[in-house]
Regions:
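Subset of outer-membrane beta-barrel
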Residues: 20-336
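Sec-dependent N-terminal signal peptides
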Residues: 4-13
Length: 336
């Protein structure tokens, strides 16, 4: 019964062409470039590599929702006198969902330029040209015209015409990002972004339904007392895309295991953090983030609270993130 309920829900979403397949991560604050091109290059170090995996609805479907992503960003043309830089990044995503194996592939390039608007306060504007493709398989789906009165006969014509074109479509995202360092212990960030400025076609059936533009507001910070090993990091994100909207808010408690070097200037701080977040009306999730100098590993688990929780027993999905940061000045010093 649970699988039937889920299949009906997935089928309705599929037919209406409103399956907004924009990837989203619970630990959105760990990779801000993926939600806002304006945040490209805002990290300690010179090069940042990020990979992520998210699995949802495994408890009610043999074909759960899986998202895999990878990204790299860096900053060039750095001017230390005014703290300006040009940020460059690339992102790749693969998303598969449901019995139809609805697949979305995305590749985009992030470009931004950051300027200092006051001492230790920076503002950046970014754009993100994007290419994506979306396709699905009809073989595992059943339709109303295949219902015989007691069962579905997949040998019957389904009466639907699926668009099988796998060519890439072009789109553009944009965003504005602010980062402020209040002192050595405290910092804040805030951003707004608009995705799908070109509103490309979204439906896989005959029709002219386009993808809604997506508006996102996000912010956060990190705060601690001087000399304290404990910090807290509140974060929030809100987005609206057509009739869909979501608000996530929560906090990470960060414990410092090792401080940054005061002599090399390299960010080799090691921390462990535990967080709890609420996605209003949808899920509660917890996070664990381990940061050991250049390497970071994050894990989160969603507990479903929406109407679908009757079928899921509250089991939403797991997420894993891996991040690696490179400091070229440290590498050069080590080679001397």
């Amino acid at each position: 019964m649970r699988k039937l309920a889920f299949s009906i829900l997935a089928l309705i979403i599929f037919i209406n062409g409103q399956a907004q397949q924009d990837r989203h991560y619970s630990m959105f604050y760990a990779a801000p470039m993926t939600i806002n091109p304006g945040a490209t290059g805002f990290f300690p170090g010179d090069i940042q590599v990020f990979t992520g995996f998210k699995n949802q609805w495994k408890s009610i479907s043999s074909n759960p929702y899986n998202t895999i992503s990878a990204s790299l960003d860096t900053k060039v043309m750095k001017n230390k006198s005014n703290n300006s830089f040009l940020g460059l990044g690339v992102n790749f995503y693969n998303d598969k969902s449901g019995d139809s194996q609805l697949t979305t592939n995305i590749a985009n390039i992030s470009i931004n330029y950051a300027i200092e608007i006051a001492d230790n306060h920076q503002l950046a504007l970014g754009v993100q040209p994007s290419f994506f493709q979306r396709f699905a398989s009809m073989e595992s789906l059943t339709w109303d015209q295949q219902w015989t009165g007691s069962t579905f006969d997949t040998n019957l014509e389904n009466g639907e015409t699926l668009i099988t074109d796998k060519s890439f479509q072009f789109d553009i995202n944009s965003g504005l990002y602010y980062f402020g360092k209040l002192n050595n212990q405290n910092s804040i960030n805030f951003g707004v972004s608009v995705a799908h400025l070109l509103t490309p076609q979204n439906t896989l059936l005959n029709g002219n339904e386009n993808l809604y533009q997506k508006y996102t507001i996000h912010g956060g910070g990190e705060f601690s007392k001087n000399g304290s090993k404990l910090a807290f990091s509140p974060n929030l994100i809100y987005f609206k895309q057509g009739p869909n909207q979501s608000l996530s808010i929560g906090n990470d408690f960060i414990y410092s295991l090792k401080e940054s070097s005061k002599y090399t200037g390299y960010y080799d701080k090691s921390t462990i953090s535990l967080g709890s977040y609420l996605r209003i009306g949808d899920a509660f999730y917890t996070t664990l983030f381990l940061n050991f100098a250049e390497f970071s590993l994050g894990v989160s688990y969603d507990l479903n609270m929406s109407g679908l929780s009757v079928a899921t027993d509250g089991r939403g999905g797991m997420e894993m993130l891996l991040r690696y940061r490179i400091n070229l000045s440290k590498s050069a010093a080590a080679s001397l």
